[in-house]
């Protein structure tokens, strides 16, 4: 009885803490939308749509809180357990096979990926399958890197070099989608698992003295694979015949509350039922795989398995509430705001500022971002603060969305951003501690999660559609996720470069303090006697 009471008290206090964190995360986006509504910046933004947005914001806070509690003690725990166990087998083929299966399973089940795939118009199963294969293969490369102590920088140069070689023969219309596919794979299901899997594997190989560095980098490599596999897929598709089909969300068309509430509750029911199935499909394969793997190879105590399953339920229902609320209230509002700004003349500057704000505040609300920055602080033993990384990521993502809006308006190729951006990012990787490079590339993948695909992307699509028409959406609107994924690579490594320079200056000042003028005289005296 006392144990149950203590457990309930712990859950209550943990939930209240996560509730407060989630509220602070979502509040800035609510503030931006509220300012736009009350100032009348968006003409077609009615009170019913605003009220539905507020209701969904409350649901997002609740869902995010439940997910964060559950993910820490379920998906992260499973990833670490399997990661530690795999290396102990000492059989490379077994490690490779299991890693590939895990990579494919967690990817094809990622809800974030399904949201993006539904907006493209390509066969969803084919697209998701190719992305899953890409993630599986490149997680294998990441695991082999840890086992054989290979340099992460060199791997990034080789793989991104291959990406830009394939970009030369990929249809420009499909190129932004290829780059976006690398970002949307790393969402709330994939990231906690892969991060913990890498940490568990790195802990098992800690004798090489690189455990901290090796804990990161898997998510980054997992983001490269889908870019390559989707580029290959595009070579076999009739890309030129693809047309984006715009559809207005019925909930944003109501100017009064007459008939609104029945439509709202009907749509809410459809979204929640849909997410119950989608998230169930997302989490079930990983859970079943863990139970079978544990039964055969680990044989954990029943108490630990039950605890993991209970927390998996928290994560499940939290993710259901989060995604349903985002799709119900956030996506249509973001689309409407973008459409309204694109339809007005002279609003590019406002669109850039609003897009930057959405990116900046949206990344704070990303479930997977909280998982990553907590692990960064843990692995670095507090030397890299989670608050600092979160702040830097938010600034970089805001800048990335602003650049995406500029590209959507002027319509130039995404390669004008990607090529110099990755040259800078890869160049910085040779100037900063390797752990910063691994953290930066992981941050890029994590930042482009469900808030990006369901809030930022619809905003950019709405803006592009209204400004230039449906025919320009594929080539100009898509690519926003790729920009969100790119900017943290530069900014987080820039943070590492700043830390390096600051350390060098401090060391120089210390040496200078101990170097007195009399020392020169003594040296000179000795030389004279010689």
What are these regions (language model features)?
Residues 139, 143-149, 174, 200-214, ...:
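Alpha-helical transmembrane segments
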Residues 51, 70, 117-129, 146-161, ...:
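Transmembrane helix-loop boundary segments of multi-pass membrane transporters
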Residues 83-85, 92-163, 348-429:
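Helix-loop-helix junctions within the multi-pass membrane cores of secondary transporters/permeases
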Residues 29-31, 91-99, 158-169, 188-194, ...:
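Small-residue-rich segments of transmembrane alpha-helices in multi-pass membrane proteins
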Residues 1-69, 84-85, 182, 195, ...:
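Signature of multi-pass transmembrane helix bundles
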Residues 179-186, 211-220, 429-458:
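C-terminal membrane-solvent junction of multi-pass transporters and transport-like membrane proteins
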Residues 169-177, 228-238, 322-329, 402-403, ...:
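Hydrophobic alpha-helical transmembrane segments in multi-pass integral membrane proteins
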Residues 41-45, 67-78, 104-116, 172-175, ...:
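Transmembrane alpha-helix boundary signature
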């Amino acid at each position: 009885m006392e144990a149950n009471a203590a457990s309930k008290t712990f859950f209550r206090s943990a939930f209240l803490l996560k509730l407060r964190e989630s509220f602070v995360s979502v509040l800035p986006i609510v503030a931006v939308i509220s300012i736009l509504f009350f100032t009348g910046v968006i003409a077609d933004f009615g009170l019913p749509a605003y009220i539905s947005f507020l209701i969904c914001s409350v649901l997002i806070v609740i869902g995010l809180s439940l997910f964060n509690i559950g993910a820490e003690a379920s998906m992260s725990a499973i990833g670490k357990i399997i990661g530690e166990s795999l290396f102990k087998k000492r059989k490379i083929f077994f490690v490779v096979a299991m890693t590939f299966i895990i990579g494919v399973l967690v990817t094809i089940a990622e809800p974030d990926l399904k949201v993006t795939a539904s907006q493209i118009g390509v066969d969803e199963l084919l697209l998701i399958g190719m992305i899953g294969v890409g993630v599986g293969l490149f997680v294998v490369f990441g695991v082999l890197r840890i086992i054989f102590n290979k340099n992460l920088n060199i791997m990034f140069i080789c793989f991104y070099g291959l990406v830009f070689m394939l970009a030369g023969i990929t249809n420009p219309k499909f190129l932004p989608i290829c780059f976006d596919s690398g970002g949307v794979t790393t969402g709330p299901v994939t990231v906690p698992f892969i991060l913990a899997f890498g940490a568990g594997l790195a802990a098992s190989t800690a004798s090489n003295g690189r455990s901290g560095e090796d804990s990161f980098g898997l998510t980054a490599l997992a983001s490269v694979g889908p870019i390559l596999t989707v580029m290959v897929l595009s070579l076999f598709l009739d890309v030129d015949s693809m047309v984006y089909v715009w559809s207005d969300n019925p909930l944003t068309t109501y100017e009064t509350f007459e008939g609104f509430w029945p439509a709202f509750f009907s749509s809410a029911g459809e979204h929640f039922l849909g997410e119950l199935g989608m998230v169930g499909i997302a989490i079930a394969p990983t859970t079943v795989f863990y139970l079978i793997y544990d039964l055969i190879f680990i044989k954990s105590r029943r108490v630990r398995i039950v605890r993991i399953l209970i927390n998996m339920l928290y994560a499940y229902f939290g993710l259901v509430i989060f995604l349903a609320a985002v799709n119900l209230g956030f996506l249509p509002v973001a689309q409407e705001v973008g459409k309204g700004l694109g339809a007005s003349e002279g609003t590019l500057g406002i669109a850039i500022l609003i897009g930057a704000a959405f990116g900046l505040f949206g990344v704070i609300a990303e479930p997977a971002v909280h998982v990553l920055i907590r692990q960064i602080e843990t692995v670095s033993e507090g030397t890299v603060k989670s608050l600092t990384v979160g702040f830097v990521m938010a600034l970089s993502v805001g800048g990335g969305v602003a650049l995406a809006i500029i590209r959507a308006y002027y319509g130039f190729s995404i390669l004008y951003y990607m090529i110099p951006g990755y040259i800078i990012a890869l160049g910085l990787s040779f100037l900063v501690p390797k752990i910063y490079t691994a953290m930066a590339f992981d941050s890029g993948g994590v930042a482009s999660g469900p808030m990006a695909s369901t809030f930022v992307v619809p905003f950019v699509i709405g803006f592009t559609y209204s400004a230039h028409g449906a025919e320009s959406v594929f080539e100009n609107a898509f690519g926003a996720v790729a920009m969100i994924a790119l900017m943290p690579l530069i900014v987080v490594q820039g943070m590492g470069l700043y830390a390096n320079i600051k350390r060098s200056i401090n060391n120089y000042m210390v040496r200078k303090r101990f170097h007195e003028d009399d020392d020169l005289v003594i040296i000179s005296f000795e030389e004279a006697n010689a």
